[in-house]
Amino acid sequence: MRGIWFSELQTPDLAISVRLNQTLHHEKTPYQELAVVDTEAYGRMLLLDNIIQTTVKDEFFYHEMIAHVPLNTHPNPRTALVIGGGDGGVVREIVKHPSIEKVTLVEIDARVVANAREYLPEIACGLDDARVEIRFEDGIEHVRQRENTYDVIIVDSTDPIGPAVGLFSAEFYRNVYRALKADGVFVAQTESPIFNSRLIRRIQRDLKEIFPIARLYLTTVPTYPGGLWAFSLGSKKYDPLEVDWRQAPKVATRYYTPAIHQAAFSLPPFVQEFLEAPEEEEF
């Protein structure tokens, strides 16, 4: 294999490797190691602590599915909070919705936003929308201090290691419930159903104790571990399987459609199996 290759060790026994054209930027921020690289296969790629966060080639699978599912589940979302997501991809999708009046992006690391703006403009372009407020602070604390504030809350976090662990806790989900308005909707990325089944099962059980409606849905993300990714949704009122598509806005997407929205909640048997398994059982 000629050239320089980057490998992300996704599990102790699995790595994904891509050939690099060049490293565009590298630094150690106050919070993490950050790099932007240009690759043969996926174009420009954002790495945090040597973990692939997003790529120009496949980012739309993830960003469209984490954003449009909750935004179309809620019939009239006006205020949205994004925790994490400093690359701007989720915000870009949110501001496509005409009902949105304000988006608050809470990102702890200002350098992520700065580098996304410079090196990933096609992903970060929504950050300059007049409806967007960017706050560089801790998302856990931000949610803890809010009550009855947001129609939609989206958690676009890194993996559950280090400071991000708190974003996967039952205490955080209870605070999210309080921060949502009476008919609010919440979605978080919740890792790989292939490699993180116990985590997903625990999160689903936590959400079912907190929200009247709790569901899991899936999408493909080629550069993420296993290529299949899970999102956990909690809703105070609206069921994502009962969207009135006649009223939903028509927004430009590359992956998400009403049919894919519905199909994403149709879980394969292996996922149903681990969701229903006793807590002590491993997969």
Curated annotation (Swiss-Prot):
Enzyme Commission code: 2.5.1.16
Gene Ontology terms for molecular function: spermidine synthase activity
The keyword Hydrolase appears for this protein: no
GO-annotated biological processes: spermidine biosynthetic process
InterPro entries: PABS, PABS_CS, SAM-dependent_MTases_sf, Spermi_synthase, Spermidine_synt_N, Spermidine_synt_N_sf
Function comment: Catalyzes the irreversible transfer of a propylamine group from the amino donor S-adenosylmethioninamine (decarboxy-AdoMet) to putrescine (1,4-diaminobutane) to yield spermidine.
Name by which UniProt lists this protein: Polyamine aminopropyltransferase
Provenance organism: Moorella thermoacetica (strain ATCC 39073 / JCM 9320)
